[in-house]
A protein has these predicted regions:
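Outer-membrane beta-barrel "beta-signal"
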Residues: 171, 303, 307-309, 333-345
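Outer membrane beta-barrel
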Residues: 20-34, 43-183, 192-194, 201-208
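Detector for outer-membrane/organellar transmembrane beta-barrel domains
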Residues: 191-302, 307-308, 319
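Transmembrane beta-strands of outer-membrane beta-barrel proteins
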Residues: 22-30, 66, 70-74, 119, ...
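Solvent-exposed loop/turn segments connecting transmembrane beta-strands
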Residues: 154-161, 182-192, 255-262, 290-297, ...
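Gram-negative bacterial Sec-dependent N-terminal signal peptides
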Residues: 1-20
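Outer-membrane beta-barrel architecture
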Residues: 13, 57-59, 109-111, 165-167, ...
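Transmembrane beta-strands of outer-membrane beta-barrel pores
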Residues: 30-36, 76-80, 125-127, 180-184, ...
Length: 345
């Protein structure tokens, strides 16, 4: 149960009562893990954020009247295995450009919400990132095969900072969102450009579907020159909940300005077993190309289970296996086995 720290009524200038609240929330997630990669010794480790990144944060809102409210979120990632500040720690499978010491590397924004939708300003996850978790197997954990298989390409930047974000209200289950991160700090040697993203999502009954696009030009050499490391990602998600099983699938295409392309696909299923136990499995595949010729193929599969001890605490276990095969090169295989516990507050 999330705990309200502050809830007070303050007289507005109009004489009406404006409600304000601030809530402390968080997740602590730690796993014992063993992993091995071809030609390397097996590693036995303790990891923070097996299923969800460990974090704590503050969020609040103020009723401004007339259906308008102000809001804010400050969210820190940390390493529960060491206690270290993690900046954007635990943002599974993505790039985070914040320094490791960033106090609120996961989120830090202020905004306004009303009948028009919601605006946010600050360190806001992108509109593309909104959809990335919604059809992923093994509870969208670090053990989902898509994270190890798709990551062979380029991990998208999910929280670039310096962002403007807008999400629409729902229209019959359909929502739209867009975000843009400013390209700051232009110099004579850095043609800093922005990062834009959009999405459309549908959620109704057992069906979820989304389409998202993100173009990242946040780092390009030479003012006025063509970006050499700009990435364009297009992601489609779909899930269908049959009750006895929830089917999941995603497809992502990444195109870069250096003529590299990556086609990425994953499918999975979540199976509830009684009220407390959920089983999940998934398969992921990706193929990279340069100038139309295949350079590498990757695939992997995983299995996971979580058992709820309460509404806020669960234990979990997972196993993931992946392999990559460069064209004309040697196949590399890896495996990960984990068991962990997560508590949220």
């Amino acid at each position: 149960m999330k705990k309200s720290l502050i809830a007070l009524a303050v007289l507005a200038s109009t004489g009406a009562m404006a409600q304000s609240s601030v809530t402390l929330y968080g997740i602590v997630d730690v796993a014992l893990q063993t992993s091995k990669v071809t030609n390397s010794p097996r590693q036995n480790t303790m990891e923070s954020g097996g299923v969800n990144g460990s974090r704590f944060g503050l969020k609040g809102s103020e009723d401004l009247g007339g259906g308008l409210k102000a809001l804010f979120v400050l969210e820190n990632g940390f390493k529960a295995d060491t206690g270290a500040i993690g900046g954007g720690a635990g943002l599974n499978g993505i790039t985070n450009t914040k320094p490791a010491t960033a106090m609120f590397g996961r989120k830090a924004y202020v905004g306004l919400a009303g009948g028009f939708g919601e605006f946010r300003l600050g360190n806001v996850p992108t509109a593309y990132d909104d959809t990335a978790i919604n059809a992923n197997s093994i509870f969208d954990s670090n053990y989902a095969p898509a994270y190890s298989v798709w990551a062979g390409g380029h991990n998208y930047n999910g929280t670039p900072g310096n962002s403007v974000y807008y999400a629409s209200p729902s229209f019959g289950g359909v929502t739209l969102a867009a975000s843009y991160a400013l390209g700051e700090n232009k110099t004579t040697t850095m043609n800093a450009k922005g990062l834009g993203a959009i999405n459309v999502q549908y959620a109704g009954g057992p069906i979820y579907a989304s389409l998202a696009y993100q173009e990242d030009k946040t780092s390009a050499p030479g003012v006025g020159t063509v970006a050499t490391n700009a990435y364009k990602d297009t992601l489609a998600n779909f899930s269908y909940d049959l009750g006895v099983v929830k089917l999941l699938t995603s497809y992502n295409r990444q195109v870069a300005t250096d003529n590299t392309k990556s086609d990425q696909f994953q499918l999975g299923a979540d199976v509830p077993v009684g009220a407390a136990l959920t089983l999940s499995g998934g398969y992921a595949y990706s193929k990279d190309k340069l100038n139309g010729s295949t350079t590498e193929k990757r695939q992997g599969f995983g299995l996971g289970a979580k058992y709820a001890l309460s509404k806020r605490t669960f234990v979990y276990t997972a196993a993931t296996f992946a392999e990559q095969k460069p064209t004309g090169g040697t196949k590399v295989k890896g495996d990960v086995y984990a068991v962990g516990v997560q508590h949220s507050f």
